Swiss-Prot record:
UniProt note on tissues of expression: Detected in fibroblasts (at protein level). Detected in spleen, prostate, testis, ovary, colon, pancreas, kidney, placenta and heart.
Source organism of the structure: Homo sapiens (Human)
Record-stated family: Belongs to the leprecan family.
Protein name: Endoplasmic reticulum protein SC65
Presence of keyword Amino-acid biosynthesis: no
Function summary: Part of a complex composed of PLOD1, P3H3 and P3H4 that catalyzes hydroxylation of lysine residues in collagen alpha chains and is required for normal assembly and cross-linking of collagen fibrils. Required for normal bone density and normal skin stability via its role in hydroxylation of lysine residues in collagen alpha chains and in collagen fibril assembly.
Location of this chain's protein in the cell: Endoplasmic reticulum
Acidic residues: compositionally biased ranges: 381-413, 428-437
Disordered: region residues: 381-437
Subunit structure, as described in the record: Interacts with PLOD1, P3H3 and PPIB. Identified in a complex with PLOD1 and P3H3.
Signal peptide start and end residues: 1-18
Swiss-Prot/TrEMBL GO biological process terms: bone remodeling; collagen biosynthetic process; collagen fibril organization; peptidyl-lysine hydroxylation; synaptonemal complex assembly
An annotated GO cellular component: nucleolus
Amino acid sequence: MARVAWGLLWLLLGSAGAQYEKYSFRGFPPEDLMPLAAAYGHALEQYEGESWRESARYLEAALRLHRLLRDSEAFCHANCSGPAPAAKPDPDGGRADEWACELRLFGRVLERAACLRRCKRTLPAFQVPYPPRQLLRDFQSRLPYQYLHYALFKANRLEKAVAAAYTFLQRNPKHELTAKYLNYYQGMLDVADESLTDLEAQPYEAVFLRAVKLYNSGDFRSSTEDMERALSEYLAVFARCLAGCEGAHEQVDFKDFYPAIADLFAESLQCKVDCEANLTPNVGGYFVDKFVATMYHYLQFAYYKLNDVRQAARSAASYMLFDPKDSVMQQNLVYYRFHRARWGLEEEDFQPREEAMLYHNQTAELRELLEFTHMYLQSDDEMELEETEPPLEPEDALSDAEFEGEGDYEEGMYADWWQEPDAKGDEAEAEPEPELA
């Protein structure tokens, strides 16, 4: 009955835009709001029944709802995570001071909880049931795009199918079957690789690529401007990612007070550690190794070419935080120090930049804490709070023979269809459909 009600509600969507058009997490249209799990579940049901247009419509809606939830979580937690007041140690010290410190800690927790409750009470994303953890992981890995590209293709929306397939591959570059579909779509539309669009791309990715191109062309001034902007935008997105990891958590076991808190904290830690990898750009099918360090590497040489040795030295010192054994950068720092009098450099000019120190310390401490939880808090299935759903993909990789032959492959993911066109431009085997919302 509830499913029918949601279905009737979504008939009102009409010509609503794609998941990122005219978006506002504060003023999300009430008529577009529904539980993420319901939207995604209905999309998969329609996919199973080969109702391609309806499936694509709900998949796009689910992606939009996921973004709404993600941005709303990050907003509230960022606004409720101000610096704690300075602690005043008890002059007597000892157990009294320890007791007071614990009370201050839990007082701070209660204050933040009250702030979050006030914030979430005003935002649309929290007016519907919260999705389960496994579903959020699926969206983080861009799994919905694996369904979406094929549903769009079968609905004769090839341009959007190309973007959806490419978006999935940007996070899953080794998924051979989707790569083959993307090549097929590109061949039908004559779409060059340079024209492909990542629907989940962060703003800093394009700025970083432009900075690298300017660097390679010798325009070091413009390159440093763009690289500094890319660095600043990345760190802002990283901070929002950390804040978004403090959202709702499920716990189904009865536990003592401190173990229960530790479980929730460990889950949040894992999410925060994953932020670095999840935000790393994919360039040409490869993730940029040590992305933040790479930006400082470019800045170091570009500033040197601009004769701004002070910034070059600080960029080199910042890079060394992430790769202290890099012999080339070590030699660069030795060179800067040797000529420090010539350039008027002070000792402070050989210190890492403030934002580099903060980012390095954050990521290092998060990894250390997570390693601690893995070593000491996972015995006796302490961290296994729920059973997760089995993966939607088969465990065995598909061979080319399976792909080219007839019959089933990736059961539950793609229809029993694959046929190379006789000539470029042949249409897919599907009835013409009206425009998708």
